[in-house]
């Protein structure tokens, strides 16, 4: 995209039209204390070639994930995406299409959204899923607001082991909705006491499995306690591949299942765009945010697809809308659908088992390093290390040796007081050589 700046003549004409003698006069209403004097000393303009060189030098400082042993996760995971996925989503009818308001000319888009919803419903063990959300964290926040509408209560209990970024998003949306959020303290080893926080005023309980530390959580007793109190259980996940191996949240009693779908079909891409997954029970479908693609028949009796429910503020009155979500993550949802279709049920299960096996091998190697403790007993493809000293320092020293060893929990939650923990993820991408390099580098760093 080219940047075409205004000429001095353009500015003079615009100021004259609105009756302002100068640019300073135009902004005279802004208090001087609020103005940044540094903006007046911006460097002179550069040529396009010069800008390209400057940006190229900056980007050269990045370390491509595929160039080093890579064990970073904590909500965004590096998986292999088949070339077929990118090839298909770049077809112009998919890449440039917008909201399918006219079903007679958008059957392809509506059908893949319908297939996406079907896949999400099967993965989560739920009866209905929407056409995607922005990402996992916003899906979690919308789930809390939905639970408040269903139960007519305003108190949400959020487990301490839910990803800190998800907790922040929930707290932000709940603040403006005038809701109460009871956030528990994190318990890295798992087994946090969620049940005692549930009472007769609770609208929902938000639990993540695998949680941010990698622990697999048994949702059934939490679901029983929540339902006994008249509350809903919201199950959250950040690693959708785990559903190829772990019992679906719906089968464990969850009422709403939300999470991040990035791991299937979508690369890391600097943290977005991603695709939020949202599924629930049929009886709650009219309180579900976003939109729903449904199957019907046309005037000739042929099978067709339409937007069935779109209770969002673009379509109805704002005060009646279930969500303000606008354009959903449609292209990312298509990538998810294509990749999962290529995998199939058997392929997804094999992929999940490979992830788990690689993580177990890595955990065994790292646990053998003196001073290192693996905190998890049951995990999928991510686990937590306790290391001597500050985890941030250890990670930086590992990076200097060419190993991206994970995410210090302190970077996600600086005030949690868990400065010695590292979240480590292993996927199908990692090799035996990668694992050996990590263990050797960690041993040297801690020596």
Curated annotation (Swiss-Prot):
Its EC number is 1.4.4.2. It holds the Pfam family GDC-P. Gene3D superfamilies: Aspartate Aminotransferase, domain 1, Type I PLP-dependent aspartate aminotransferase-like (Major domain). It catalyses: N(6)-[(R)-lipoyl]-L-lysyl-[glycine-cleavage complex H protein] + glycine + H(+) = N(6)-[(R)-S(8)-aminomethyldihydrolipoyl]-L-lysyl-[glycine-cleavage complex H protein] + CO2. Keywords: Oxidoreductase. Transmembrane segments: none annotated. The glycine cleavage system catalyzes the degradation of glycine. The P protein binds the alpha-amino group of glycine through its pyridoxal phosphate cofactor; CO(2) is released and the remaining methylamine moiety is then transferred to the lipoamide cofactor of the H protein. Belongs to the GcvP family. N-terminal subunit subfamily. NCBIfam families: PRK00451.1. This is Probable glycine dehydrogenase (decarboxylating) subunit 1. It comes from Azorhizobium caulinodans (strain ATCC 43989 / DSM 5975 / JCM 20966 / LMG 6465 / NBRC 14845 / NCIMB 13405 / ORS 571). The gene is gcvPA.
């Amino acid at each position: 995209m080219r940047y075409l700046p205004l000429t001095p003549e353009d500015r003079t004409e615009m100021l004259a039209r609105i009756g302002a003698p100068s640019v300073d006069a135009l902004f005279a209403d802004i208090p001087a204390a609020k103005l940044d004097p540094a903006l007046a000393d911006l460097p002179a303009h550069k040529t396009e070639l010069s800008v390209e060189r400057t940006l190229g030098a900056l980007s050269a400082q990045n370390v491509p994930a595929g160039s080093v042993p890579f064990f970073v996760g904590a909500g965004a995971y590096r998986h292999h995406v088949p070339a077929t996925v990118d090839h298909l989503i770049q077809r112009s009818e998919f890449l440039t299409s917008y909201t399918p308001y006219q079903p007679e000319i958008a059957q392809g888009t509506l059908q893949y959204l319908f297939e996406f919803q079907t896949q999400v419903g099967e993965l989560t063990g739920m009866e209905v899923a929407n056409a995607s959300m922005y990402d996992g964290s916003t899906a979690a926040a919308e789930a809390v607001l939905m639970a408040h509408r269903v139960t007519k209560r305003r108190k949400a209990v959020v487990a301490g082991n839910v990803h800190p970024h998800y907790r922040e998003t929930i707290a932000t949306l709940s603040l403006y909705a005038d809701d109460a959020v009871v956030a528990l303290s994190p318990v890295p080893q798992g087994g946090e006491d969620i049940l005692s926080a549930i009472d007769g005023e609770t609208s929902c309980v938000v639990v993540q499995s695998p949680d941010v530390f990698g622990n697999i959580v048994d949702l059934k007793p939490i679901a029983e306690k929540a339902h006994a109190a008249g509350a809903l259980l919201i199950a959250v996940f950040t690693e959708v591949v785990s559903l190829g191996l772990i019992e679906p949240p719906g089968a464990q009693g969850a009422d709403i299942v939300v999470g991040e779908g990035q791991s299937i079909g979508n690369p890391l891409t600097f943290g977005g765009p991603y695709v939020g997954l949202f599924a629930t029970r049929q009886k709650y479908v009219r309180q579900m945010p976003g939109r729903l693609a449904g199957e019907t028949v046309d005037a000739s009796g042929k099978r067709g697809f339409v937007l069935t429910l779109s209770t969002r503020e673009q379509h109805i009155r704002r005060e009646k809308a279930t969500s303000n979500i606008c354009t959903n993550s449609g292209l990312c949802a298509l990538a998810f659908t294509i990749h999962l279709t290529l995998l199939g049920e058997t392929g997804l299960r094999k992929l999940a088992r490979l992830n788990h096996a690689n993580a177990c091998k890595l955990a065994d190697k790292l646990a053998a390093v003196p001073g290192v403790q693996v905190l998890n007993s049951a995990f999928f493809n991510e686990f937590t290390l306790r290391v001597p000293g500050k985890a941030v320092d250890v990670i930086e020293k590992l990076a200097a040796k060419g190993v991206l060893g994970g995410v210090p929990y302190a970077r996600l939650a600086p005030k949690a007081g868990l400065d010695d923990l590292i979240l480590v993820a292993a996927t199908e991408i990692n090799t035996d050589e990668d694992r050996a390099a990590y263990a050797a580098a960690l041993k040297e760093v801690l020596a």
